[in-house]
């Protein structure tokens, strides 16, 4: 069967998946093994004392690990990181900036934390030798019902970001407003 990881590896890229949680969640292990990922990092690869949330390892630790590993990489790479701190119950290792008295504020605080972790990673990456030849793709696995009390049936809960950035982009500061879905990502990358 076609597989994004197989296609990327065939072009000479080193592939890896980083997730601070249980690797069998959502069948991640099977998916990345089927694709032949060169490296799979999960909560089992971190010191047990770092696992201080229901889901596993907080995003800042996983982003730092990814950044350190990328700095050792000598071949073209296709690395994926799946965050977890922005998922319920929204456990974060910092003071909740929006409070935590209800799910909406807890969600916003968790998103602020994850955004800060991502922002730090991007700012560090911009100072590396590999940034100019790197494409960073940011998207989500699903939307949320935590904001404005939407329900799973409302279209707003299906809106997710798709952001492309990096030194490898020839065109920047472009907004494309046409509708697409996660299924469009692999053919666009290839």
Task: Describe the function of each predicted region.
Residues 1-190:
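Solvent-exposed soluble domains appended to multi-pass membrane proteins
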């Amino acid at each position: 069967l076609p597989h994004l990881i197989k296609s990327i590896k065939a072009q000479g890229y080193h592939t890896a998946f980083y997730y601070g949680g249980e690797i069998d969640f959502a069948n991640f292990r099977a998916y990345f093994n089927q694709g032949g990922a060169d490296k799979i990092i999960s909560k089992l690869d971190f010191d047990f004392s770092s696992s201080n949330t229901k889901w596993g390892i907080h995003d800042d630790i996983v982003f730092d690990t990814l950044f350190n590993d990328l700095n050792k990489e000598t071949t073209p790479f296709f690395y994926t990181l799946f965050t977890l701190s922005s998922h319920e119950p929204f456990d974060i290792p910092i003071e909740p900036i929006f409070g935590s008295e209800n799910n909406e504020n807890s969600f916003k605080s968790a998103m602020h934390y994850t955004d800060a972790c991502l922002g730090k990673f991007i700012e560090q990456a911009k100072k590396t030798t590999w940034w100019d030849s790197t494409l960073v793709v940011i998207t989500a696995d699903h939307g949320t019902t935590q904001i404005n009390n939407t329900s799973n049936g409302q279209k707003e809960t299906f809106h997710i970001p798709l952001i492309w950035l990096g030194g490898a982009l020839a065109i920047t500061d472009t907004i494309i407003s046409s509708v697409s879905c996660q299924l469009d990502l692999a053919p666009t990358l290839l």
